[in-house]
């Protein structure tokens, strides 16, 4: 989603 927290998920996207 948006770079607010830390990278999450296998793709390493920001949530």
UniProtKB/Swiss-Prot annotation:
pH profile of the protein: Optimum pH is 5.0.
BP GO terms, sorted: cellulose catabolic process
UniProt subcellular location: Secreted
Keyword terms, alphabetized: Carbohydrate metabolism, Cellulose degradation, Glycosidase, Hydrolase, Polysaccharide degradation, Secreted
Catalytic reaction(s) noted: Endohydrolysis of (1->4)-beta-D-glucosidic linkages in cellulose, lichenin and cereal beta-D-glucans
GO cellular component: extracellular region
Chief location of this protein within or outside the cell: secreted
EC id: 3.2.1.4
GO MF term (any one): cellulase activity
Role description: Has endoglucanase activity on carboxymethylcellulose (CMC).
Protein known as: Endoglucanase 1
Biological source species: Hypocrea rufa (Trichoderma viride)
Taxon lineage: Eukaryota, Fungi, Dikarya, Ascomycota, Pezizomycotina
């Amino acid at each position: 989603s948006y770079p607010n927290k830390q990278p999450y998920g296998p793709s390493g996207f920001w949530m």
